[in-house]
Design a protein with these regions (language model features):
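Active-site region of the double-stranded beta-helix
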Residues: 1-54, 71-121
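Histidine-centered metal-chelating micro-motifs
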Residues: 34, 58-60, 64-69
Length: 121
């Protein structure tokens, strides 16, 4: 599994008088997953985009302020666990407005291809 650099924490919620941001933790239980992550500025410009391939047993921490999607890139069903704080709220308005993440994952005969979503310019 590829490693991710931890970005600086960005406040997303308040908890017990302290500023707290919330990551998510995923574990792949079965199948082969491609986690697509993106972080955008307040105007919607993509600051960072990552693709992380994970197999059974791999764990991935999604940093706060990253939009993410999980794609099954294998031939068997994909099963994963997601640990997230109940106080966490996700906002995917920009992703819906742009018809997906900044990159699409397309199936090919011998795997997959990642292509840019033209809605992000």
């Amino acid at each position: 599994m590829e490693s991710l650099k931890r970005p600086p924490a960005i406040t997303t919620a308040l908890c017990r008088g302290r500023d707290v941001s919330y990551p998510e933790i995923y574990e792949v239980l079965q199948g082969n997953a491609l986690f697509m992550l993106q972080r955008c500025d307040s105007d919607g410009a993509v600051l960072e985009a990552l693709a992380v391939n994970a197999k059974p047993g791999d764990k991935l921490v999604i940093p706060p302020q990253y939009g993410h999607a999980t794609v099954n890139i294998g031939d068997e069903p994909l099963v994963f666990a997601d640990l997230v704080a109940t106080a966490c709220s996700n906002t995917y308005g920009q992703i819906a407005q742009n018809h997906g993440m900044c990159s699409y994952v397309l199936k090919k005969d011998n795997g997959f291809e990642i292509v840019q979503n033209p809605a992000y310019g």
